[in-house]
Swiss-Prot record:
Keyword Repeat carried by entry: yes
PROSITE patterns per UniProt: HEXAPEP_TRANSFERASES
Species for this entry: Protochlamydia amoebophila (strain UWE25)
Free-text function comment from the UniProt entry: Catalyzes the N-acylation of UDP-3-O-acylglucosamine using 3-hydroxyacyl-ACP as the acyl donor. Is involved in the biosynthesis of lipid A, a phosphorylated glycolipid that anchors the lipopolysaccharide to the outer membrane of the cell.
Protein name in UniProt: UDP-3-O-acylglucosamine N-acyltransferase
Family under the similarity heading: Belongs to the transferase hexapeptide repeat family. LpxD subfamily.
Presence of keyword Repeat: yes
Amino acid sequence: MNEKKHFTLQELALLTDCKLVGNPSQIIKSVADLENASEEDASFFANNRYLQSLKESQAGVVFVDLQTPLIEGKNYLLSENPSRSFQHLIDTLYPQKKHPSGFTGIHTSAVIHPTAEIGNKVTICPQAVIDEGVKIGSGSFIGAGVYIGSYSEIGEDCTIHPRVVIREKCYLGNRVILQPGVVIGSCGFGYTTNQQGQHIKLNQVGNVWVENDVEIGANTTIDRARFKSTRIGQGTKIDNLVQIAHGVTIGSYNIIVSQTGIAGSTTTGKYVVIAGQAAIAGHLHLKDHVVVAGKSGVTKSLNTGKYSGIPAMPIKDYNRNQVFLRKIEIYINQIKNLEKRVLELESQN
C-alpha cells in the first residue's frame, strides 16, 4: 500500500472543491465508514437510512450534501455529490498503480504466437496465451492466465484481469476493463430440434464488439452473435455474473447489475439501467433512459420510463397492485359477505 498523506480540513476543502463547516486545522489521515471512523478519518453521508450513524459518527469530517442537517461542533465538507468528492480524497490518499501487478513487460512463461502484434508498453503476465493474429494496443495489461483467441484485437490502455477468456475474432476498444473470469465470445445458445427430438447445434459465426471505456464484472459472459455482432456500447458498466446472449446490442452508458440475463437479439438504448436479477426476453428493445427494477421480468419492448414486476409494468402500476395484493384477504372476506347477503336476499324473495 502506498504511504498515506495527511491533510488539514482547509487543504481538503481546496482539494475536493467543497465548502468547509468546522475546524480548518483538523488533521485527516485516512478514510472509513461512518460507524468505524475516528477523529483522524474522513467519511461521507449520502443516504438517509444512515442518518443515525451520521449523528453518532466520530469521524473527523463527513462529506455531506447541501441539504443534510448539520450538528453543531462537528466538521463537514459540503458537496453537491458527497460520494464523488469522497472518492477524490480516497484516490489522493491511496493512489492506484496503473495496473494491478508487480510484473512489467512480457513474462517468459507467456505463450505468444509469432504472428501476434504487441504494442508499446504492454504487460503480459505469466501463463497468458496470445493466439494467432492477435493485436494488442499500446499500454494494455494482460493478466496471468488470460487467453486471447485468434485474430482478436485489444485496444489501447485496456486492463484484462487474470483468467479472462476472449475467444477468436472479438474486438475491444480503448480503456476497456475486464474483471477476472469474464468470457467474451463464447458460442451463443442456439439449437434446432429434429424430428427425433434431438437438439442440433447451430454454429455461431459472428463476434463480439466491446466499445471504449466499458467495464465488465467478474464471471460475466457475453456470447458471440450467430451471424453479425454482439455489441456493448461505449461507457457501459456491467456487474459480476451477468449473461448477455448472442446478437444483443447494449447501448452507450448503460448500467447492468449482477445476475441479470438478457436473451438473444434484444437491444437497449442509451443510459438504460437494469437492476439485479432482472430477466429480459429476446428480440425486444428498451428505449433510452429505461429503468428496470430488480427481479423484474421484461416480456415486451419498453418505452422510456421505470418498470417493475413480472411481467414488467410501469412502476406506478406495480406499486398500486402491490397495495391491492396486501389487502386481498380483506377483499376476499368482503366478497364472501356480499355473496352471503345476496343469497339471504334471494331466499327472502
